[in-house]
Amino acid sequence: MVLSPDDKKHVKAAWGKVGEHAGEYGAEALERMFLSFPTTKTYFPHFDLSHGSDQVNKHGKKVADALTLAVGHVDDMPQALSKLSDLHAHKLRVDPVNFKLLSHCLLVTLAAHLPAEFTPAVHASLDKFLASVSTVLTSKYR
């Protein structure tokens, strides 16, 4: 999915507002995903999935760090996320549908925390961005 110049501007501005809360929002999105889509828990059998667990918080930070990397390399996400794509395709073997589920939960989390910034245009741009990240992360499944 191609991001327009306006999409890129919206994504960078929105992620800039996330700032130091990125890890917190990443963990919250994971918790939302586990609660809303319980089958996603199967990829984390060794995690304490309770609210506020250190493992979920640490993984939420990893998710947020990957998104920060993608935002910073929005014009070259395949290169920037190549190692992460390899990890998810070859080692973790995460079902690609789970990226869509997490993307949805990230959008809900961002809308809850940034209601003034979460305009329809920003929502659409973030949705396209997360779809692009998902496409990159699943590109090596083929």
Curated annotation (Swiss-Prot):
The modification Phosphotyrosine is found at Y25. The modification Phosphothreonine is found at T109, T135, T138. Red blood cells. Keywords: Acetylation, Heme, Iron, Metal-binding, Oxygen transport, Phosphoprotein, Transport. The modification Phosphoserine is found at S4, S36, S50, S103, S125, S132, S139. Transmembrane segments: none annotated. Pfam families: Globin. One of its GO terms (biological process) is hydrogen peroxide catabolic process. The modification N6-succinyllysine is found at K8, K12, K17, K41. GO terms for molecular function: haptoglobin binding; heme binding; iron ion binding; organic acid binding; oxygen binding; oxygen carrier activity; peroxidase activity. InterPro entries: Globin, Globin-like_sf, Globin/Proto, Hemoglobin_a-typ, Hemoglobin_oxygen_transport, Hemoglobin_pi. Belongs to the globin family. Involved in oxygen transport from the lung to the various peripheral tissues. This is Hemoglobin subunit alpha. It comes from Papio cynocephalus (Yellow baboon). The lineage of its organism: Eukaryota, Metazoa, Chordata, Craniata, Vertebrata.
